[in-house]
Amino acid sequence: MKFNVIVVCLLLNCAVAVAQPAGVALDTITVRHVDFQGQTQQGVLICNKTRAKDLREIFDELYKAKYPIERVRPISEYGDDDERSMRANNTSCYCYRPIAGSKKLSKHAQGLAIDINPLYNPCVRRQKDGTLLIQPATGKPYADRKKPFKYKITSRDLCYRLFIEHGFRWGGSWRTLKDYQHFEK
């Protein structure tokens, strides 16, 4: 696969080099969000240009509703390490990587997917030996969706409703695995 290397200048006084698959148009957008302390923050998402308008509209509605999102930073600030970003409960879109346990590229590799508050909304997969693989590993306390806890995305949640209204699919409704943090379109 061919790559173009682009430099994305962020509004937060930093520059990030991003390996971008040839033919994929990425955009850098700034979104306001309310953090877990109730403070307004400026977040940065690198996403596919075809998703930028939807994401701006969704984040605007989440912000107006004071929906808590701990942090929104490019994955490059975590050394392009998805697990590290998820452990920090970082909401992000673009990450050039395959689907976990596969050679097939993730929707994140094209900026077509977003993970919201991933620590509290882990990806849960039952392995062939019957054990659960939970990502991030530190999200284990939040894998049991029957337990009550803050920041949990459910089908009754505002975040869920907004993404669905914009035509996204939720990983929490998948059959083979449950990726509660994940929305893609």
Question: Over which residues does each language-model region extend?
Answer:
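Catalytic cores and adjacent binding grooves of peptidoglycan-active enzymes
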Residues: 99-101, 114-185
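Extracellular/periplasmic catalytic domains that process cell-envelope and extracellular macromolecules
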Residues: 22-25, 105-111, 164
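Mid-length scaffold segments of soluble, non-membrane domains
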Residues: 84-119
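Bacterial N-terminal signal peptides
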Residues: 5-14
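Active-site acidic/histidine clusters and adjacent loop/turn architecture
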Residues: 23-86
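Stable alpha-helical elements in mature extracytoplasmic
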Residues: 51-58, 112, 155-159
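Boundary at the C-terminal end of the N-terminal hydrophobic targeting segment
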Residues: 17-19
